[in-house]
Amino acid sequence: EINTDNISAKDEFKEIKYILQKINDYVFQSPIGVMYNVELITEYIRNRVIYEGENYRNATLTLVRSKLNQNFVIVNDEYWRCYTWIDGKTYETTSDPEVFYEAGKAVGKFQHLLEGFHTRCLTDNIKNFHNTPYRYETFRDVVKIDDLDRASECKKEIEFIKKRANKMSVITDALAEKRIPRRVVHNDTKQIGRASC
């Protein structure tokens, strides 16, 4: 989780909103690597959007740079970053076909805009985060140990996962065999109900 605060500033003409975030350096042990990735990806997308003649303002996040022109600051050994504000909303579930449509549109647009982006330039900030076979093995170990005695409360869910164990490596196998390309992933929807950023 990233700790977030909303802030705003006024000039003589309008109020400008920002989102100030403390990067959780327990989860993201290399905040510098995270910000390196964010900057590479957002700049690549911004340049593609401009090249395609579209409005770039809400097409990607806009980092607010420090006085030293950095994309983050360190205060009391904590890493902070700032973006211009984009109104947002997260959907945990939905039955609205428009929300499904916009989610698919966002994923497709994101992948389109990152066409040609070289993922080997990125840093791997959470080791094995998308390594589903590794995640499944960890899951099995935790269920087996059950040191908090909770497995009995979720037998149905555990069986659901176990029945799908043979599918856990479909993507990692395809990546290893170069049948599919390695891609950048990130999912984010905004309050306007349309894929925007």
Residue locations for each model-derived region?
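Active-site acidic catalytic loop and adjacent metal/ATP-binding pocket
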Residues: 1-16, 20, 63, 166-196
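ATP-dependent phospho-/nucleotidyl transfer catalytic cores
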Residues: 21, 28-33, 86-106, 116-186
